[in-house]
C-alpha cells in the first residue's frame, strides 16, 4: 500500500504532464522534495527521458521541460531552485510549477519570480491538490519589431 504523500504525488503527475504538453520523446527534469518519486512515476508512464534534480547531469540546456513540485515549501526557497534550473533548460523550454493553493499576493510573487527569470506565463490552473502555472522561455516568443 502506498503512503498518502506518494499517492498525492501520483495525482499531480497527469495534470502536470497535460499542462506542459509533454511527449515521451522530450527530456524532462523534475525538481522538488519528491523529485525521485515523480521521476519514477514518469518512467512508469513511458517518459523514459525524465531525470530527477539529483541525477540530471551537468547543466547544458539539455531539458525541454521542467516539472517543479513545490507543495509544502516556501516561495523564498523556490528562488534558489529556479536559479539552479535555468542552465539546464533549453531556449524553448517549458516550466510547470505546482504549489499549494495560495493567497492572491503569493500567486503574484510566484508569477513575478518566474517572469524575472525570462519566462512568459502561459496558463495557470487550480486543482484539488494545489495550483500550477505553465510558463515558456521568452525566447520562444520573439519580440516583433514595429513596421
Which role fits each region the language model picked out?
Residues 1-25:
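Class I SAM-dependent methyltransferase Rossmann-like catalytic core
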Residues 11, 15-16, 34, 39-62:
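A short, well-structured beta->alpha microelement
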Residues 23-37, 97-120:
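Conserved class I S-adenosyl-L-methionine
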Residues 35-38, 69-76, 101-104:
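Short acidic, S/G/P-rich loop/turn micro-motifs used as interaction or catalytic elements
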Residues 55-76, 80-83:
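A short acidic, Gly/Pro-enriched loop at the edge of an enzyme's catalytic core
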Residues 77-94, 111:
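A short glycine-rich, Lys/Arg-flanked "PGG" loop and its adjoining helix->strand segment in the class I
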Residues 113, 117-147:
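Core SAM-dependent methyltransferase catalytic element
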Amino acid at each position: 500500500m502506498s503512503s498518502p504523500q506518494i499517492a498525492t504525488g501520483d495525482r499531480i503527475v497527469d495534470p502536470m504532464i497535460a499542462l506542459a504538453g509533454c511527449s515521451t520523446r522530450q527530456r524532462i527534469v523534475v525538481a522538488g522534495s519528491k523529485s525521485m518519486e515523480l521521476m519514477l512515476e514518469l518512467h512508469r508512464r513511458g517518459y523514459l527521458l525524465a531525470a530527477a534534480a539529483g541525477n540530471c547531469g551537468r547543466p547544458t540546456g539539455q531539458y525541454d521541460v521542467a516539472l517543479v513540485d513545490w507543495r509544502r515549501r516556501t516561495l523564498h526557497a523556490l528562488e534558489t531552485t529556479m536559479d539552479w534550473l535555468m542552465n539546464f533548460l533549453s531556449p524553448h523550454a517549458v516550466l510547470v510549477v505546482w504549489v499549494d493553493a495560495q493567497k492572491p499576493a503569493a500567486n503574484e510573487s510566484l508569477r513575478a519570480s518566474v517572469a524575472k527569470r525570462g519566462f512568459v506565463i502561459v496558463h495557470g490552473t487550480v486543482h484539488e491538490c494545489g495550483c500550477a502555472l505553465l510558463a515558456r522561455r521568452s525566447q520562444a516568443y520573439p519580440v516583433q519589431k514595429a513596421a
